[in-house]
Amino acid sequence: MTHDTTSRPSSSRVWRLLLVGSALTAVVGGGMHPDSDASDPLRERLATMTADDQWVLGHAFIVVSTALLALGLRAARQAPGWSPAVRRALTVAAVAVGLYVVETVAHLAAVVDSDALAAGDAAPVAWAHVGLSAVLYPLSGWAIASLALATARGASPLRRVVAGVGLLAGVVHAASIPLMLLLPDLEASRLFPVAAIGIALWTLGTGLLGAPRTAPAGTEVPDRAPQPVT
């Protein structure tokens, strides 16, 4: 008679598939994001982009991508091989990215204010999305950067490279909206695709690599092989 360990590898596959799916949908959605002149005022840029036919579908992919990432990070906490510090960072990141999903939905919904933005009228949904992004971009970005840093400690060289990409992408993501709002002449909106591509690469790399087979010193990794009951 043996213990049933089928749920453990199945759970491991689920979170990794969620992360890979998040990365792929992020690439699709990001590739559909409308362009605008970074030197234009924010209202004008929003009016231009929300009027584009690709806005709704592209941002729908981004909503799905962000939701998959939040679910994947939450599920990854159960994977054997993580240190306690990484598990804590996964918990924080799952919550932060889960909150960031709200911003992506508001971002998508800003399309309802497209005409109002162009006419200079009140655009409550569009500006609500900007307000949410001012809080949730830094929150989710620093959570991702902190998680990437935690996974780099004691990791293999390849995992450190992936973590380095996540650290850089998280910092850029966190800083992009505050810089855009506080220093409009800096044209910080150019940072958005850099952060998006970096996070997608980090997410894909983490999903493909999975959790380490051995935890850092001081932590015990359960044996994944079936054990006989005596």
Predicted features along the sequence, with ranges:
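Hydrophobic, aromatic-enriched alpha-helical segments typical of multi-pass transmembrane helices
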Residues: T2-T230
